[in-house]
């Protein structure tokens, strides 16, 4: 259903972390790898 697609998109966005978003759970090195 649509909800499943939304959840999947959210999971991907959270995993990849969009530019400008700095999750406190991820270390600076991890964020650099994602942003870089």
From Swiss-Prot:
GO terms for cellular component: chloroplast thylakoid membrane; photosystem I. The keyword Manganese does not apply. It is found in: Plastid, Chloroplast thylakoid membrane. Keywords: Chloroplast, Membrane, Photosynthesis, Photosystem I, Plastid, Thylakoid. Its main location: plastid. Disulfide bonds: none annotated. It is a peripheral membrane protein. One of its GO terms (biological process) is photosynthesis. PsaD can form complexes with ferredoxin and ferredoxin-oxidoreductase in photosystem I (PS I) reaction center. PSAD may encode the ferredoxin-docking protein. Belongs to the PsaD family. This is Photosystem I reaction center subunit II.
């Amino acid at each position: 259903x649509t909800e499943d697609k939304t959840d999947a998109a959210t999971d991907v966005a959270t995993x990849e972390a969009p530019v400008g978003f700095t999750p406190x759970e991820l270390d600076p090195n991890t964020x650099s790898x994602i942003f870089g």
